[in-house]
A protein has these predicted regions:
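Short secondary-structure junction motifs
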Residues: 47-49, 131-133, 218-220
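A broad, low-specificity signal for short, low-complexity segments enriched in glycine/proline
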Residues: 36-38, 99-100, 146-152, 166-170
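Feature captures outer-membrane beta-barrel proteins of Gram-negative bacteria and organelles
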Residues: 36-43, 61-81, 111-123, 159-169, ...
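Outer-membrane beta-barrel channel domains
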Residues: 53-148
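Outer-membrane beta-barrel initiation region
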Residues: 1-73, 77, 157-181
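Outer-membrane beta-barrel proteins
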Residues: 25-27, 40, 55, 66, ...
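C-terminal outer-membrane beta-barrel translocator/porin domains of Gram-negative envelope proteins
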Residues: 85, 91-93, 105, 153-264
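Transmembrane beta-strands of outer-membrane beta-barrel pores
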Residues: 22-28, 43, 54-58, 71-73, ...
Length: 264
């Protein structure tokens, strides 16, 4: 009976990466397309969906897997990616939390592995021409990038646990519109690294976004605000920011971080 969850229904000579949860909350829409191949599966009820993919980018042959089950609440989504790049070993060599000097050594020929298990309740509160929803969520993430633990005297892999709550309320869109005409949403998250001991603290993250009409009929304007605070007292490392960096910039390490951005 379990095999009925995996019925191949289509394939494509490309690898397409989609972020399902952000599409649900209207926070972000994006597709990443790479040379490769993808096989898609779905059961007859449409409650189980899967994907196996291969991609080639930047000189790396990569494997990808996705599986989601929505037959009951909560929804479960699992994803894993192998060999998108070489893995890294990160060591704190000098400085303090405000000016950390961390060395990231690339382990050539050692594939990077990342995996996550997300569970959430997509509560649909839509009515009267508005799409509304409340999404409590719990996410576990793993990567074989490693940091040096001075207490343990060895490198340890990364594990993150994030609990969060999202709310969105947007006016239903016409197909020709890039953004909803009116709407807003908010996202509150708490991120921690279990088993990290003296190395990592935790992060509180909040972001809000809103949509307003643009200067012309169809294009709209999206305004975004984000704030995060890392509780890092007595810890050796900072986690990468949950808040997005400005376009064209690499991820930052910050104790306090605030951003405001428009999109048109």
């Amino acid at each position: 009976r379990g095999l009925h969850l995996f019925r191949i229904h289509s394939w494509t000579p490309l690898y397409v990466n989609t972020d399902v949860l952000n599409n649900i909350s209207y926070e972000n829409f994006y597709n990443v397309v790479s040379p490769g191949a993808s096989i898609y599966t779905q059961n007859s009820l449409g409650t189980a969906e899967g994907m196996l993919g291969y991609s080639y980018h930047g000189g790396f042959h990569s494997g990808h897997m996705r599986f989601a089950y929505r037959g009951f609440y909560p929804v479960f989504e699992f994803r894993a990616d192998l060999n998108d790049r070489d893995k890294q070993r990160i060591t704190l060599v000098a400085g303090d939390l405000f000016n950390p000097e961390m060395v990231a050594d690339t382990v050539k020929g050692s594939p990077y592995l990342s995996a996550s298990l997300l569970t959430y309740f997509p509560l649909n509160l839509s009515s009267g021409g508005w799409s509304r929803g409340l999404i409590p969520k719990l996410n576990w993430r793993y990567s074989n990038d490693s940091y040096y633990s001075f207490r343990e005297g060895r490198y340890q892999d990364y594990q993150h646990i994030t609990v969060g709550l999202q709310y969105y309320q947007v006016q239903r869109m016409a197909l020709r519109n890039l953004f909803p005409k009116w709407g807003f949403g908010a996202n509150l998250q708490f991120n921690m690294m279990p088993f990290a001991g003296e190395n990592f603290g935790s992060t509180l993250y909040f972001n809000a976004y809103g949509y307003i009409p643009g200067l012309m009929k169809n294009p709209g304007i999206r305004l975004s605000f984000a704030y995060q605070r890392q509780m890092s007292e007595g810890k050796r490392y900072l986690m990468r920011n949950l808040a997005s960096s400005p376009r064209g910039h690499a991820a930052h390490y910050s104790i306090n971080y605030t951003s405001l951005s428009p999109d048109y």
